[in-house]
């Protein structure tokens, strides 16, 4: 049996554990963001990397390489103004890139924070003209999603205010409800509207969608195809994110995740670099809900800004970490855990739970990759391929001069 201690994992033979693990890994896919390959940074600036992608084609090429190495990233999240600056006119080019590189367009992310008109908000702006502009961009994003066959429209807004008394919070709620209802009316039957929340930044007095309760309300108001999007970095320190996940699962409002890690706020560090146990706990709640007939149709997405780590290396590392933590959580003996919880055997329950987390699942993930014709160690394979060095040579003159965010 793999490491982790006696009684910490489901009581199966090694062959049965491998069979179970392979099934769990077969079910796991995670979307990677186009902007994660570009020269993104912080509000204080950024450090350019020669191998960073500077065009939508280079982003697709990088995404395809990550999928070739890991086998679990078949879709690329797109940011409308960064990746499709001409809107629907850019769709044919994106479709051609899908065919060329073998990865598909994933979630469509509207950009409601970049234009100068959004200084005082987008869908919540006191100006009806600006609100109409923002709503028009939402509807354009939905049409782009339809044209690309993308299911999810992932909405994050920077709307809020910095000083007490400067905005009517309730008026802004009403404007937002109206815009989301209208957006929902334009969804195709197979599309979803995912409403993301964030407690602060760039607004520091109030943020219009600040927590999961507000997102839940807005999703219900918008319509039956709306769900909540949880960004793991968009919470106050020490907040119990897995409890939020459990509530959203219970109320059938969990639509997906933007995965990243943080030490203080929305740091956009690589997943599991600071608190891997938290991600394990989140995945456990999802596995437990799935056992109860809930938890299906959850979109797993990465949302990170690789300002110091190499873009490709960080993305591959994140995908591998996500697989490992997902599998660790799958290996919890939930039947035995339920028995221990019912009897309030606190130490035994916690030790069983922690034992799965401490289990070294790398032999299982490596065996799964080999069984699927993938490199056993994707990071080593990336390094040995010379891909990053080739990209640096080909892109360096452009990437080191780029000034836009993504």
Regions found by a protein language model. Name each.
Residues 7-37, 41, 45-47, 64, ...:
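Histidine-acidic metal/acid-base catalytic patches
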Residues 27-48, 110-125, 157-163:
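N-terminal small/glycine-rich loop or linker at the start of catalytic domains
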Residues 23-36, 50-81:
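Catalytic domains of carbohydrate-active enzymes, especially glycoside hydrolases
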Residues 47-51, 75-92, 161-164:
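Glycine-rich, proline-tolerant flexible connector loops at the mouths of alpha/beta enzymes
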Residues 12-24, 100, 105, 117-223, ...:
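Active-site acidic/histidine proton-transfer and metal-coordination neighborhood
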Residues 36-38, 80-84, 109-114, 157-161, ...:
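Active-site-proximal loop/turn and secondary-structure-junction residues that shape catalytic pockets
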């Amino acid at each position: 049996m793999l490491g982790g201690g006696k009684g910490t994992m489901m009581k199966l033979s090694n062959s049965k554990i491998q069979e179970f693990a392979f099934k769990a890994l077969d079910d796991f896919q995670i979307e990677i963001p186009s902007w994660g390959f570009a020269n993104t940074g912080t509000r204080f600036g950024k450090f350019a990397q020669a191998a960073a992608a500077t065009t939508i084609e280079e982003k697709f090429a990088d995404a395809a390489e990550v999928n070739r190495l890991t086998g679990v990233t078949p879709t690329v999240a797109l940011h409308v103004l960064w990746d499709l600056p001409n809107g629907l006119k850019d769709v044919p080019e994106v479709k051609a890139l899908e065919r060329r590189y073998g990865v598909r367009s994933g979630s469509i992310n509207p950009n409601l924070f970049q234009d100068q008109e959004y200084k005082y908000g987008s869908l919540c702006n006191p100006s009806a003209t600006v609100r109409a502009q923002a709503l028009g961009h939402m509807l354009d994003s939905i049409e782009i999603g339809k044209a690309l066959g993308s299911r999810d429209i992932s909405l994050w807004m920077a709307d809020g205010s910095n000083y007490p008394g400067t905005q009517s919070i309730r008026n802004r709620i009403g404007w937002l409800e109206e815009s989301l209802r209208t957006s929902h009316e334009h969804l195709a039957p197979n599309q979803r509207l995912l409403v993301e929340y964030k407690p602060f930044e760039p607004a520091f007095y109030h943020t219009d969608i600040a927590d999961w309760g507000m997102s839940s309300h807005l999703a219900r108001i918008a319509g039956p195809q709306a769900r909540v999007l949880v960004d793991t970095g968009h919470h106050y320190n020490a907040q119990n994110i897995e409890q939020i996940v459990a509530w959203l699962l219970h109320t059938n409002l969990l639509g997906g995740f933007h995965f990243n890690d943080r030490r203080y706020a929305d740091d956009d560090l690589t997943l599991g670099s600071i608190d891997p146990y938290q991600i394990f706990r989140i995945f456990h709640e999802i596995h437990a809900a799935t056992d109860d007939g809930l938890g299906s149709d959850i979109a797993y997405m990465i949302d990170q800004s690789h300002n110091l780590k190499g873009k490709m290396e960080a993305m591959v590392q994140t995908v591998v970490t996500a697989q490992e933590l997902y599998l660790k959580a799958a290996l919890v003996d939930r039947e035995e855990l339920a028995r221990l919880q019912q009897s309030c055997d606190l130490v035994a329950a916690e030790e069983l739970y922690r034992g799965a987390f401490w289990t070294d699942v790398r032999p299982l993930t490596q065996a799964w990759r080999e069984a699927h014709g993938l490199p056993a160690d994707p990071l080593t394979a990336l390094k040995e391929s010379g891909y990053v060095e080739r990209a640096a040579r080909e892109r360096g003159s452009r990437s080191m001069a780029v000034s836009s965010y993504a």
